[in-house]
Amino acid sequence: MRLYELSFAQIEDFFYKLAEVKDIIKDSGLMEFLPELKKLDSTIQTGTTRVKHAFPIFQKGGVVMDITNVQQAQIAEEAGAVAVMVLDKLPYDVRKSGGVARMADPKIIGEVMNSITIPVMAKVRIGHYYEAKLLEALGVDMIDESEVLTPADEEHHINKWEFSVPFVNGARNLGEALRRTAEGASMIRTKGEAGTGNVSEAVKHMKIINSEIRSLISMSEEDRVKKAREYQVPYQLVELTAKIKRLPIVNFAAGGIATPADAALMMWLGADGLFVGSGIFKSQDPDERAKAVVLAAACWEYPEIVLEAQKMISEQKSMMGIDIKSLKPEELLQVRGL
């Protein structure tokens, strides 16, 4: 069978099984008696730009769920999430409790890593280099430099090129997305307005990014040079974005996604995948809702399937949403980290 006759899912499954076999051999101690495998293991590259940018591609089409403990992580894995994001508090609780929001307890993150088989991500404060170094040492699969947590640096983000672990960053527009890419991010997510259960800001940010990419495509070279200066990014990055007609890295949607219909809407708008925060575990039906959101994200092109996903949940059990217009300017999380 030729490679191009295989589906992406079959290829992905093959590589996962290959990794499992390698781990079994390594754990059994047989690696010491198989010099060729030992040599291969020592030459495997990790942390390269290619590896860091490839990892998010394997999450495409899927849902990453915010969780705070092992039980929630297991629910997410059983529902079909492609990864989990570990926090100390869900965004809704961060918003309600106030104070300083920091990186989750490393012990909790470690427990989650030992309890599930899907990738584990965790958040750090914007600009907090050392929280990121701790998560890298812990062995998380991806770091989210997140506006949901209280920024450690109001002016600068982390230089992500210095790390071997991939990073995801939020963006509201193309300028923010390309600046984070230039800093070394491997994935972008729309900021939306986390912890509200209101998808309107995520919709707005996704549409802004798409619109600004379309404008870039029709610009002259001279105008693109001006735009690169405006965005404060290398011209080559602007040129590449115009050439491929999309962001150079994976772009997920996040912020206020609470229902299967929300999930399908963001995929329809062009998201490569989804981050779902408080919408799952601040609802009264997290098990069913997690499965329904995953189904809707995977089958967004088929309204009849999304309808069945929507029927799996009860609107009366959805999280209590927050009207964006009721928030004061200082209460908006999306304005952190421009």
Swiss-Prot record:
Q: Name one GO biological process term.
A: pyridoxal phosphate biosynthetic process
Q: What chemistry does it catalyse, as a reaction equation?
A: aldehydo-D-ribose 5-phosphate + D-glyceraldehyde 3-phosphate + L-glutamine = pyridoxal 5'-phosphate + L-glutamate + phosphate + 3 H2O + H(+)
Q: Which residues bind D-glyceraldehyde 3-phosphate?
A: K207
**A GO term for molecular function:** pyridoxal 5'-phosphate synthase (glutamine hydrolysing) activity
Under the heading InterPro entries, the entry gives: Aldolase_TIM (IPR013785), PdxS/SNZ (IPR001852), PdxS/SNZ_N (IPR033755), RibuloseP-bd_barrel (IPR011060)
Q: Where does D-ribose 5-phosphate bind?
A: D66, G195, G256, G277, S278
Q: What is this protein called?
A: Pyridoxal 5'-phosphate synthase subunit PdxS
In the UniProt record, what gene is named as encoding this protein? pdxS
